[in-house]
């Protein structure tokens, strides 16, 4: 697997999660939503959060948009980005997402592992995201000091 695709994947994952922190803090203009959020995803995106619901792009966009400026203390740290497979024009990757003061999550300090599929394009497109909680013992061992 090429180093450049791994770097592109890592940067894209970190950039999207930085968007979340800034969006929920109200630090971005609302007019930036489509260019900084919606445009990152394939139109037929599938997102499965830890609770197991199946969301498409319209549903996910609505939830994120409605959360604007709702949680200024929210923080995310991305860890362990790993490219698992490259096939045709797609990449399968995993990463850990650690959240601090996530008011919409139970518990608000939490960790999850995500499996994602990207379409290799310019820019990369998120096609599929599946998150699951990290074990409670793992979550409890973190200091959440990011």
Predicted regions and their residues:
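A solvent-exposed, acidic/Ser-Thr-rich amphipathic alpha-helical stretch
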Residues: 31-89
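Short, cysteine-centered beta-strand-loop-beta hairpins and adjacent loop/turn segments enriched
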Residues: 70-73, 99-110
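Short hydrophobic/aromatic-rich beta-strand segments that constitute the beta-sheet cores
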Residues: 47-48, 93, 128
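Short beta-strand edge/turn micro-motifs at domain boundaries
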Residues: 109-146
């Amino acid at each position: 697997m090429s180093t450049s695709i791994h770097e592109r994947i890592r940067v894209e994952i970190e950039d999207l999660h930085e968007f979340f922190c800034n969006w929920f803090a109200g630090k971005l203009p609302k007019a930036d939503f489509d260019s900084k959020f919606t445009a990152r995803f394939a139109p037929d995106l599938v997102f499965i959060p830890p609770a197991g619901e199946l969301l498409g792009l319209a549903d996910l966009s609505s939830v994120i948009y409605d959360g604007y400026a709702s949680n200024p203390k929210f923080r995310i740290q991305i860890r362990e980005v790993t490219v698992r497979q490259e096939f045709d024009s797609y990449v399968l990757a995993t990463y850990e997402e650690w959240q601090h003061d996530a008011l919409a999550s139970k518990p608000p300090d939490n960790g999850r592992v995500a499996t994602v599929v990207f379409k290799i394009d310019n820019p990369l497109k998120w096609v599929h995201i599946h998150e699951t909680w990290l074990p409670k013992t793992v979550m409890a061992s973190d200091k959440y000091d990011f």
